[in-house]
Amino acid sequence: MKTKTKPEIKSDILSWWLLIVVPLVGIVVVNLPPNLRFILDRFSNTIPENFDANYRYHFSEGLRNNPNPKEAIQQEIAFYQQRLAIDSRSGLNRAALAGSYLKMARATGEGGWFLLAEQAAQRSIADLPFDNKGALLVLARIAEARHDFATALRLAKQVGSDNEEAIALEVTSHLAMGKVSEANAAAEALVNRIPNLGSLTLRALVRESQGRDAEVLQDYRQAMAVEEPGEVAGSARARSLLGRFYARRGQFVQAKALFLEALRLAPRYPLALIYLADLETRQGNYREAEGYYSKVSAYSGGVETVFDRIVDRGMARVKDLQGDAIESRRLRDKAEAGLRQEQVSGSGGFGHRRDLASLLLEKGRSQDVAEALALMQEEVKIRRDAVTLDTLAWALSSAGEWQKADRVMAEIVR
């Protein structure tokens, strides 16, 4: 058996962000002003009649006056900063500020907010070294995003198994490491404890990794049945992930309908926009794909975010398919420069070593293949999920090590 030598760029390049950086429940996106939201309702007119009614969002009236989450987070930050101006040694207030910084990082995708969250959490623990679960959870999420899973799990254990966010951390960390049995046990415990939109979505992701497709759909339907009006962003996330599930199985009409429904809820949601762009690319609709990628960049307002490299690579693929080799090379070089800078910046890079390896494999030069293989041999020491193993197999086959590549692929299908 020969392993693939040049797979297409998949939306799997976002997996680390989906499972780690994005929170369990009530994720935050930066929405359009309410008076512009109903322009996006036109999306619903394009949704096919056979769209599963279970996936419709049933609180549309509540979208009319949905506030801008970014402004709400800014108010939170200002509130805790004022509290700390009065009592600068308050560990609890600083832990809350760290949590608000982390919310803003998730809302904007800007790396600077993650750094502020980490610094605030560390100082909070210095001021309040005992019973400081809020600060520990912030540090655990940041460690996990940097693929320091051992630290993330250690911190989650310190928080305790009676904390839903700590259990969610166990799910995502174990899943990223390829420890599916442990992830499944944690997901079951979480759903048994709190069967809500977030926990059921997490269990669906675990079951998808196990190939339990019927149960995946059951979990998503149950998740949407119990969703509440106040968790619009979590509802958008669930539909985006379910859309990805359908897209992976070639059910493009259902997938697109779910992505559009997600954007009706959260018009600037980058996850849905990137998945839509990927879907349009796969179907040969390159102009539409470019449009969705461009929206991700435009909504960031020119500020660097964690999505920039994904957009650059996606656009490079579109240009390549359009026959524009010069622009495709420019975009790949831009993405590579950004990924390399993150590797040496000391900011952690948030686990982009695999992305850099994948990009180098796309370029295909012998020196790039050698570097990519070295990167992946290091990466699998800390995580062995399916996407990581797939990238390692790609690197091995590109280097002519077919037997080793086949053994890695066999590990994936076990």
Regions found by a protein language model. Give the residues of each.
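Residue-level recognition of tetratricopeptide repeat
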Residues: 99, 103-106, 141, 172, ...
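Structural motif corresponding to the intra-repeat A-B loop/turn of tetratricopeptide repeats
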Residues: 104, 108-111, 146, 177, ...
